[in-house]
Amino acid sequence: MLPEEQASNSRYFYELASARFGFSMDKVARCQAFHFKAGQGAKTGTGGHLPGRKVTPAIASVRGIPVGTTAVSPATFPDLATPADFKELADEVRGVTGGIPVGFKLSAQHIEEDIDFALDASADYIILDGRGGGTGSAPLIFRDHISVPTIPALARAREHLDSCGVGRGSERPVTLIVTGGLRVPADFVKAMMLGAEAVAVSNAAIQAIGCLGMRACGSNNCPVGIATQREDLRSRLVVDASAERLKNFFEASAHLMAVMARACGHHELRGFEPGDLTSWKRGVADLAGVRYAGARGRGAGEAG
């Protein structure tokens, strides 16, 4: 966690990954939400690897490791294995912070089983990361061939949460956040129609600030200065101008989503529902659990 970033943020999510680099309850106490990173859609089961050449004094200070040391994260939490283990730490976080939400980030694999694990660990929210999401560095075979694609993963997650009695309007609702390949307002709207209560973006955000999609994040040679520690390249990123572009992207996205909500007859974005969505592709309709738009082959549950 960068202290200056957290200090200027009123809604900061603390994500705890398996290596716990720089973790302390003092830092968590300054945040507004906390979640365990149990998986990432683009590199499930592989942990993390930050080359030593990227570990500058600033990064070393934040992570609590020597400058120039390669940082390797294990695939799983070494000291947390069962839902009870995670719940114990989650309760400690709530006690220290006065009860901030505690969640789980899950890659879209064994969706229902993983959600059950998170619920048993007392999750207040779930971030579901489907195939299609970005990563700075992962083997292509992982990025392109693992994880359930985001749309069917979202549909399954929404259905399962509702069946567990923790859906919207329940006594203890669990918030469903989705991410993974969602880039533009139309994607965000469709995700909310399928039951997501929030959408998280990363690739779209870095594109808004100038990413060219060169896919050189792991090389330390990002030509626009975003994913590099080389000072000659970092100087190419004009922070204030990039921040303005990012603000414009989010504001324009929210505006267009509001336009779509009004067109669907809703007074607010949370009014989106599956009935707002249809597909003329039979396979997509089946995967997403929405109405098929064709004139033939419509089942009884697809009328409308």
Region locations from a protein language model:
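Short, structured secondary-structure boundary patches
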Residues: 9-21, 146-150, 218-225, 288-296
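Terminal amphipathic helices with adjacent charged low-complexity linkers/tails
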Residues: 4-9, 121, 125, 129, ...
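Glycine-rich phosphate/ribose-binding loops and adjacent secondary-structure elements
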Residues: 74-234
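Phosphate/diphosphate-binding loops
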Residues: 6-39, 148-149, 158-159, 165-174, ...
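Active-site-facing alpha/beta catalytic cores
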Residues: 1-92, 96-119
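Short capping/connector residues at structural and topological boundaries
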Residues: 60, 64-67, 77, 82, ...
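C-terminal extensions of enzymes
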Residues: 237-304
